[in-house]
Amino acid sequence: TIAHSGRGICRNAGSNIPWELMPDLYQYTIDRDSTTLWSVDQSKFRPDLTVIYLGANDFSGWMMPDNKKFNKGYLSLLSEIKANYGEEHPILCMTPGPYEFLFLYVRDVVNNCGMKNVYFLGHCPMIHNETNEDLGAGWHPNYNGQLKIAHALIPYIATITGWGLQDVLVK
């Protein structure tokens, strides 16, 4: 898991200064330490799938990022993942939050990236409530919000990977 609050594809939350963006931080073993780059050759772990759930920070503060810059950053991240795990490795690109343009931006990147096994899942704004019921610190989904996202995501992952669905309660 690579996660960092406030980071975006081409613009961080509340800032137009493009520093420490997620495509840059992707290869870091230790957060914000560029001297500790991760290497696929040194790791025995190979994920079955990569899920990208980015973009809300790029649209934060009701600022809309430049489409070309966003596409370039997103393609850079997709290319890094494919370079690490190969063309056959599946990547599911999801859109967080109620941003219609983010949906369009990510869908455009996925549809035009020219890479195999890159999928798009754009969910509606009401995947979780925009209230304390489903959100925690910094407008990030809390346990309840993440559970709702997981329930929407599970069928897509099962289809992409060929995994069967099990009749069990997801907690």
Feature-to-residue mapping (PLM):
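Catalytic His-Asp segment of secreted/periplasmic serine-dependent ester chemistry enzymes
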Residues: 13-21, 96-171
